Every structure is written in structure tokens, then in C-alpha cells.
């Protein structure tokens, strides 16, 4: 679900935290990607011309494999080294959000069934996309594909986005990539959004710098987390009637979520606290996430196993052999020499004095002669 309204608040108060660029601008970078999030995107976006998911002859869905294979190759071709991080067990507090998602899927199934044969292709497709979920089998297939491609993947003990942020904080990668804005609660130096979107969607990649974001909001780490909880996150529901502007204002006025809760309890306000609202437990999950220390994780990119890819993707999953071989060659070429250095890795940026430096007298005379 992410955090409602956080994106807009940061754009409003911390515009310098945002940058937009194309995939090629990330050349020379290593990036930790929330695998479950991008698999979900692939299952929704990678479709046949009739709107149905890709399948093999046995009727097994292959949209997730197609998306993972070709988008990863595109990154490697742009000299980007991806590492995919998979979710572990969900926190107990997330059970409520997961239950809501299940109920939404059940409702979508009822609405789709009610359409019968009278629904348009667009209507049926709308409900089918709401029914999408990433299965355990699809996760395992994605891991197998990545292994054959020579791309590292990490099994997080808990939340994938928290582990992505840990890898970024620990210097193993440049940034964490996820569509969930709550990734920022785990303090990655940079958050990348839309990284795994298809180029056909023509959406630039968004980069959000964590330090600039909280500096623009003029908040501490703790206040930022409290703001995210107040806006509504996966771990607990929001307070009815409190939107992004009000949430920001309340944090500024009261300083913490504890003080806001006390203010609501002790004063006649239009706000009602949810029953047994676990805001402090949610805060602890953001403050002390269950992750594997970055220093304990070794990331290695290897040459693809072409024979293994042919066996899995062509013989088992029904993909074109020519396309898989072509993709494997692109992987070999992209991964062969390692990550090339970026220019900003060779040059130190030095701030110049704001005052205009005095012109060299010789330069001044020369320039005057040229003008004559």
C-alpha cells in the first residue's frame, strides 16, 4: 500500500530531494530491487494483445518471467547491476493489511463473475488486474531465472524494502528501488521509483534523496516515521479525517505521534482514534526492522548459464529459443567487464566562492583586444 500522500508532501516541501531521469543515467550503479513489487507489476503489465497474461502450452502464467528477463537485460545493457530482494515472513502487524487485500480480491472476483458474458474486454481486464497476486511458485520461478541469468538475489528475513534500504545504507548498492514510499522510513540514501516499469509507459525514473527529503520537511527521523504512520501505512490504519496537509500540520504543532494521540484523547476534536491503534508497534518496525546486516551479504554477478536458460525458459516455459539466446548474449556482454566507473567517482566536486572572482588583468586585456 505504501504511505498515502507522502509523495506529494515531499514534492511540496522538499523539491530538491526529487530528480527525474532515464534508465541510462544510472549507468555504473548497483541497485537493490524489491522483487515482489516488480513481479506484481509484471503480472499486471505484461499481457497479450487480447489483454490476457502470457502463458505456456500448459496454461501456466509466464508474464512474470518475461518481465523479469527482459527488464533485467535492459538494466544490464545500461551498465546497471541489479540485485533482487525477496520478502520473508510478513510482520504480525501487516496481517490486517493482507486481510484487506484478500477481501478486495474476493470482491473483484464477485464483480467479474457478475459481469458474465456481458462485460466488455476493458471491464473484464480491470477486474482481472485486481485479482493479481504473486504466488510462492512464481517467486521461486523468478529466483531460478535470476540464478540462471547470473543475477544475485537475497531472501530478506522480513520486509524486502527494509532489506533493500539496509544494502544501500551499508554501501553494497547505490539505492533501494521500490514503488512503496514507506521504503524511505528505513533510511536508504536514495529511493528509486518506476525503475522496473516498461519503457513503453514512457515514465521517467524518480529518485528521492532521503536526507534532502527530511531536511525540506524539517523533521527528525522519528518525526518522519510518525508522519508516515499518521498518513496510513501497511502496519496500521490511518485516523479518519486526517489527510496529508493535516498530518503534516499536526506533527509540526505537537512534535510526535504520542503527543497527537494524547491531544485527541484529552480534547474535543472531530478525530477518533482507531480501537487499539498500534502506532508505537508500527514505529518500532520502522525504527528496528528485521534485516540481515549488509556486511554479511556478498553480492556476485556471474556469467549466465545459457544451457540452463534454454532448458528452463524454452523447453519448460515455452519461450522462443532465439530470443532467449539473444538475451543471454546481451547479459554476457553487459556483465563481462564489471560496472564501469562513473565520472562523479573520479572527480571531487568543489564548491566555489559565491563572490565573482577577480579577472586576471592579462585575460582582461586580451579579451578587450579581441573585442576590438
UniProtKB/Swiss-Prot annotation:
Belongs to the XPG/RAD2 endonuclease family. FEN1 subfamily. The keyword RNA-binding does not apply. Structure-specific nuclease with 5'-flap endonuclease and 5'-3' exonuclease activities involved in DNA replication and repair. During DNA replication, cleaves the 5'-overhanging flap structure that is generated by displacement synthesis when DNA polymerase encounters the 5'-end of a downstream Okazaki fragment. It enters the flap from the 5'-end and then tracks to cleave the flap base, leaving a nick for ligation. Also involved in the long patch base excision repair (LP-BER) pathway, by cleaving within the apurinic/apyrimidinic (AP) site-terminated flap. Binds 2 magnesium ions per subunit. They probably participate in the reaction catalyzed by the enzyme. May bind an additional third magnesium ion after substrate binding. Phosphorylated. Phosphorylation upon DNA damage induces relocalization to the nuclear plasma. Residues 1-105 are annotated as: N-domain. GO terms for molecular function: 5'-3' exonuclease activity; 5'-flap endonuclease activity; DNA binding; magnesium ion binding. Interacts with PCNA. Three molecules of RAD27 bind to one PCNA trimer with each molecule binding to one PCNA monomer. PCNA stimulates the nuclease activity without altering cleavage specificity. Residues 353-372 are annotated as: Disordered. Its main location: nucleus. Residues 123-254 are annotated as: I-domain. Its cofactor is Mg(2+). This is Flap endonuclease 1.
Amino acid at each position: 500500500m505504501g504511505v498515502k500522500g507522502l509523495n506529494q508532501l515531499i514534492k511540496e516541501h522538499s523539491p530538491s530531494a526529487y530528480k527525474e531521469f532515464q534508465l541510462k543515467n544510472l549507468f555504473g550503479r548497483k541497485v537493490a530491487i524489491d522483487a515482489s513489487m516488480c513481479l506484481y507489476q509484471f503480472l499486471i503489465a505484461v499481457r497479450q494483445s487480447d489483454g490476457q497474461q502470457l502463458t505456456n502450452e500448459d496454461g501456466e502464467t509466464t508474464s512474470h518471467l518475461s518481465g523479469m528477463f527482459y527488464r533485467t537485460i535492459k538494466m544490464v545493457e545500461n551498465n546497471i547491476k541489479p540485485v533482487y530482494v525477496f520478502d520473508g515472513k510478513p510482520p504480525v502487524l501487516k496481517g490486517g493489511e493482507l486481510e484487506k487485500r484478500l477481501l478486495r480480491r474476493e470482491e473483484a472476483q464477485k464483480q467479474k463473475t457478475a459481469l458474465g458474458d456481458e462485460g466488455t474486454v476493458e471491464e473484464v481486464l480491470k477486474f482481472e488486474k485486481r485479482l493479481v497476486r504473486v504466488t510462492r511458485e512464481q517467486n521461486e520461478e523468478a529466483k531460478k531465472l535470476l540464478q540462471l541469468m547470473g543475477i544475485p538475489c537475497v531472501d530478506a528475513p522480513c520486509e524486502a524494502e527494509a532489506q533493500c534500504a539496509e544494502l544501500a545504507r551499508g554501501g553494497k548498492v547505490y539505492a533501494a528501488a521500490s514503488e512503496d514510499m514507506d521504503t524511505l522510513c528505513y533510511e536508504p540514501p536514495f529511493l528509486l521509483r518506476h525503475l522496473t516499469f516498461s519503457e513503453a509507459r514512457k515514465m521517467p525514473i524518480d529518485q528521492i534523496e532521503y536526507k534532502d527529503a527530511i531536511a525540506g520537511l524539517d523533521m527528525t527521523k522519528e518525526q518522519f516515521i510518525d508522519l508516515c504512520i499518521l498518513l496510513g501505512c501497511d502496519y496500521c490504519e490511518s485516523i479518519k479525517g486526517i489527510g496529508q496537509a493535516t498530518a503534516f500540520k499536526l506533527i509540526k504543532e505537537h512534535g510526535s505521534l504520542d503527543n497527537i494521540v494524547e491531544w485527541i484523547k484529552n480534547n474535543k476534536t472531530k478525530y477518533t482514534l482507531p480501537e487499539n491503534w498500534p502506532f508505537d508497534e508500527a514505529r518500532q518496525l520502522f525504527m528496528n526492522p528485521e534485516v540481515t546486516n549488509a556486511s554479511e551479504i556478498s553480492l556476485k554477478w556471474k556469467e549466465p548459464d545459457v544451457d540452463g536458460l534454454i532448458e528452463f525458459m524454452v523447453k519448460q516455459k515455452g519461450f522462443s529459443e532465439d530470443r532467449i539466446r539473444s538475451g543471454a548474449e546481451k547479459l554476457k556482454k553487459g556483465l563481462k567487464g564489471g560496472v564501469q566507473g562513473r565520472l562523479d567517482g573520479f572527480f571531487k566536486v568543489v564548491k566555489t566562492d559565491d563572490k565573482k572572482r577577480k579577472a586576471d588583468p592579462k585575460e582582461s586585456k586580451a579579451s578587450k583586444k579581441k573585442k576590438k
